[in-house]
Regions:
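Gly/Pro-rich active-site loop or hairpin
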Residues: 42-50, 80-88, 111-169
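Active-site acidic/histidine proton-transfer and metal-coordination neighborhood
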Residues: 1-104
Length: 169
């Protein structure tokens, strides 16, 4: 956000989320960045936005020395152009962070498909870096809004390839 007030509010909420995760015994918190982006490119400084995202990831790592951060990328919706649209972007944030071992990726099949990518390839990429923390297996019929279809409901072959990649890892 461009507003310092909004960023401070978001940081307070983030700390509360980490505290709740710890209270219920969770070792991880999912960072879903689909709202981190823009509808109008000229409205935000993208370089500064990426720097702020990294600073926030580092602050989260400092706030709780044990928590893992699982970044779930999504290319659009609700924001038209997200700053972390793919697992490659998420892993770049991970490697740039102060403790990349605690920053991993969570892939939702439909989100990869919305980016025009093959979800099984995204999973294989994250697995090759030992950074696939979790998956949400679902399906998508084209580059529309996030449909959250049942896994294999639109493309059985794509579903098979995701299972194959996960089984072979």
């Amino acid at each position: 956000a461009n507003s310092a007030h909004d960023r401070a509010y978001a940081w307070d909420r983030t700390k509360k989320c980490i505290d709740i995760a710890k209270a219920v015994g969770s070792k991880a918190i999912v960072l879903w960045l689909a709202r981190e982006g823009t509808y109008i490119r000229e409205a935000k400084d993208a370089k500064l936005a990426y720097q702020r995202l990294l600073a926030t990831v580092d602050a989260m790592l400092d706030y709780d020395q044990d928590i893992e951060i699982w970044i779930e990328p999504k290319p659009n919706e609700p924001t038209d152009q997200a700053y972390v649209p793919t697992i490659g972007h998420a892993l770049t944030l991970s490697y740039a962070s102060k403790d990349h071992r605690r920053v991993k990726g969570l892939i939702e099949s439909a989100h990869a498909m919305l980016a025009g990518l093959d979800a099984s390839d995204e999973m294989a990429f994250a697995l090759a870096h030992d950074k696939l923390a979790s998956v949400h297996l679902n399906d998508q019929n084209g580059l529309k809004y996030d449909q959250d279809k049942n896994f294999g409901g639109a493309n059985l072959r794509a579903a098979f390839n995701q299972v194959r990649v996960l089984e072979e890892s």
